[in-house]
């Protein structure tokens, strides 16, 4: 196992309109970002977890490294990748701290698929109708070819 989990938690959540940053909102008695960290730790898939944030956070787990993020998401991702580039991880998972509703099983499936592929992206099929508005016409889209 040579995996790294990068958790992006430096965002401002401009659309969220709260004094508290979304990733730090308390949910089930802990900050939202901690749900993702806990799942990454419980999965036993990762040698290291990199928390990218612009807030002052201290965590005691030695697997977790905390680094300063950038102004934009891509800058935070790049800072994290530069931070780990000499560590020779086989796989790197990058996730958004404000979206903790993934399962440990999903992490394990992604890891398994990385044994056969260079990159993987999780998705779900849609069940609802999907429409496309183009040149004053509403066009029905084939749900079997649309994923979230």
Where are these regions (language model features)?
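Active-site glycine-centered loops adjacent to acidic/histidine catalytic or metal-binding residues
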Residues: 11, 96, 125
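N-terminal glycine-rich phosphate-binding loop and ensuing alpha1 helix
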Residues: 2-53
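Conserved core of the sugar-phosphate nucleotidyltransferase
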Residues: 102-148
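Conserved beta-strand scaffold positions in the cores of enzyme catalytic domains, especially
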Residues: 24, 66, 119-121
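Short aromatic/hydrophobic "clamp" motif used to bind/position activated sugar donors
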Residues: 92
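Acidic metal-phosphate-binding loop of nucleotide-sugar-dependent transferases
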Residues: 14, 97-101
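Residue-level signal for inorganic ion chemistry
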Residues: 7, 33, 80, 95-96
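Conserved N-terminal catalytic core of the sugar/cofactor nucleotidyltransferase
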Residues: 32-89
